[in-house]
């Protein structure tokens, strides 16, 4: 049962303790933690080692791997960055602060995935969300490139905006 932003993001992002390339080809680990957009694996490992504070262990497949607690630590930092970027956004902060807790999680999920500056470009959708016109906002969000690129995830998030419930997160 999803009851927190962490649960929601873990559902959408998954949690992989082994370094991998995301859909954009970027080195990622943990709960959707972007290590770098640099395509050089050795550079990604160096960055990751700086983030976790020690040499990365290699698993049996000789791939860099972190512990569950390191994944948790990276996630907490990423979550703080996402929430702080919402709070520091002139476009998003007022909208976010006037949402119920489930819809706050939905907006934070979008920011976690795309960044506050990209979410701020959803002008029509954000206006409809601000006006609490949930059905219209859902239609607008469904017509986005975001929905085309990650339809399963975006449809779950859109459902939260539309219904105010977490029923799509089972």
Swiss-Prot record:
UniProt keyword ATP-binding present: no
Annotated catalytic residues: 13, 22
Catalytic activity: Hydrolysis of (1->4)-beta-linkages between N-acetylmuramic acid and N-acetyl-D-glucosamine residues in a peptidoglycan and between N-acetyl-D-glucosamine residues in chitodextrins
Gene3D superfamilies named in the record: 1.10.530.40
Tagged with keyword Flavoprotein: no
Lineage top rank: taxon: Eukaryota
Name this protein carries in UniProt: Probable T4-type lysozyme 2
Biological source species: Dictyostelium discoideum
